[in-house]
Amino acid sequence: PVGNGSPGANGDNGSSPVDGQVVRVTGIVTAILKKGFYIQTPDDQADKDPKTSEGIYVFGENSVGMVSAGDLVQVDGTVTEFRPRTERIFLSITEITKPTVKVISKSNPLPAPIALTSTDLDPKGKLDQMERFEGMRVTGDFVAVGPTGGVTNEKTGFSGSNGVFFAVLQGTPRPVREPGLGI
């Protein structure tokens, strides 16, 4: 997002260099969830630094009802590194909390998704190698390889996803584990 928080709001590694600071960012709403929404820098304003993300999550239930996908918004709030669950192995998610949101314009085109390739996903890469895509629209030729954290009701036949799933790019050799002993 453009502003005094970008590219610094997300930074170029696993945590934000402005964690705990109040920032002002501007971006296009790309997705709306129950407790917040994602914004991303318009394509023509992206910083072109391949190590930094152009997107960020805005956490705040009260602001969800006032935005729509495609809105250009200005957000003032505190940058926070949120770690889902209590397990230390999960990476933190950079988000803006306690937001004040102002809609600048509506019906803007969404930023183009970044096409992920096998060069973006190095099995021997750093744990935070995907940080540069955090909060951004991405696409790829993916194959799901693991279950979601959603819900399944066998009695009614309903299943729902929480949006979290495990996937690999099509053509990835042995996508579930690293090469080892032949079985």
PLM regions with names:
Residues 1-183:
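Extended non-catalytic accessory segments flanking core domains
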